[in-house]
Amino acid sequence: MNPPILERDPSDPQKEKKEGVNPVLKLVLELGPLLVFFFANARGEWLVQKFPVLGEFGGPIFVATGLFMAATAIALIASWLLTRTLPIMPMVSGVVVFIFGALTLYLQDDIFIKMKPTIVNTLFGGVLLGGLYFGRSLLGYVFDSAFRLDAEGWRKLTFRWGLFFLFLAVVNEVVWRNFSTDAWVTFKVWGIMPITLLFTFSQMPLILRHSLDDKASGEEKAGK
């Protein structure tokens, strides 16, 4: 049987047997396109001097957008080659990057690439909270079986991440509408990631309280 293109359901026992990507490599694949975007925007004129063909894109933000799209495609292809699956979040984000990036380049209007984080985070937040409304905790797809939680743990974590994504959408709107393009790019790369890491670490107490692995380990010790 051919492997699934998308990630398996978190409750699928076969998913637990799947070898994940090396965490460092996974981080590189996720952060790589953002770093390319930041560098290309900061050194856009230099890049055009070295590679005149990039001048066809327009100013630095448009050069950065074109290279961001290319880097995103490479990251998704690399993920597929390494795991034979496409992680849900990077895949959805990639689709939005291609659509809004294409609009940015075609119309020569950077408003589209600036709105991309708003659209993606609103979509993720809406899907997670909407799933809870219908009794489904969908965050297991996002975390790719990094850990196993009980039902209550997944509900709480899904709710918190849903609100966090909506918060990121609002923050992006505030920043791009009130600050320069360079400031927005810098915040997108060096602001959003630290905020996300801090939020992630702040959820560890909840994860530990509801971890099925810890409960199984405790029961195993009690049985000895």
Curated annotation (Swiss-Prot):
Pfam families: IspA. The chain crosses the membrane at residues 20-40, 61-81, 86-106, 123-143, 156-176, 187-207. Keywords: Cell inner membrane, Cell membrane, Membrane, Transmembrane, Transmembrane helix. One of its GO terms (cellular component) is plasma membrane. It is found in: Cell inner membrane. It comes from the Bacteria. InterPro entries: YciB. It is a multi-pass membrane protein. Belongs to the YciB family. Plays a role in cell envelope biogenesis, maintenance of cell envelope integrity and membrane homeostasis. This is Inner membrane-spanning protein YciB. It comes from Mesorhizobium japonicum (strain LMG 29417 / CECT 9101 / MAFF 303099). The lineage of its organism: Bacteria, Pseudomonadati, Pseudomonadota, Alphaproteobacteria, Hyphomicrobiales.
